[in-house]
Amino acid sequence: MSTPPASVGPDSRDWRREGIRVVRAKRRSGDTPATLGMNREVAISGSRTGSRLLWAGTNRIEGGAKTGAHHHGELESIIYVVHGEALMRWGDRLEFITKAGPGDFLHVPAWLPHQELNASAEDELHCVLVRSGPEELVVNLELDAAAEPEWISWD
C-alpha cells in the first residue's frame, strides 16, 4: 500500500466541500455524447463533480435495439449489467460476440471498436458505466460488420 502525500490529512483540504459527493438519480444528465441507439446519462465527471480520473453514468437500451459501432479512444470502460441481457460485439469488423447478464461486469479496453445490443426484444437493458477519464469520449464508427460473429465465452 502506498504512503499518502504529506499534504493529505485533516487540515490539508476542505473535506466538507471536497469530500464525498452524492449525485441523486434525478440529477443525472443526458447532456453527454452518446451513440445512436442508447440513452446515456452522466452522474460523475470532471465538469459536473470535479472528478479528476473517472467518469460514471448509466446506459439504457430499449428492447431489440442496438448501438452503432464506436470506441472511447484512450479510455478504458467497465460496464456493470443491472437489468436485462447485453450482447457485446467487438473487433475491427465486430467479429466477436459475448453475452452478459445481471451482476456481470464487462471490461472494454481502450480503442476497442464495439457495439452493445439488447438481447431481449421486449425488456430494456440497464447498465452502469465507469470510464478511466473524467470526461466522456465517444468516437462513432462506420464498420463493415461480420455477418456471423464468433461467440466468445468465459464460463
Residue ranges of predicted features:
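Short glycine/proline-enriched turns and hinge-like loops at secondary-structure junctions
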Residues: 53-54, 72, 100, 119-121
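A short, N-terminal "cap"/entry segment at the start of jelly-roll beta-barrel domains
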Residues: 1-53, 68-69, 140-155
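A short hydrophobic beta-strand segment most commonly corresponding to one strand
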Residues: 59, 78, 107, 122-141
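Short, charged/polar surface micro-motifs in flexible loops or helix N-caps
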Residues: 48-52, 61-65, 83-87, 136
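Conserved short histidine dyad/triad with adjacent acidic residue
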Residues: 40, 44, 57-73, 110
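Conserved metal-binding segment of the jelly-roll/cupin
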Residues: 90, 100-120, 130-132
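A short beta-strand-loop-beta hairpin characteristic of the jelly-roll/cupin
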Residues: 66, 74-102
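Short strand-connecting beta-turns/loops that link adjacent beta-strands
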Residues: 49, 74, 93, 121-122
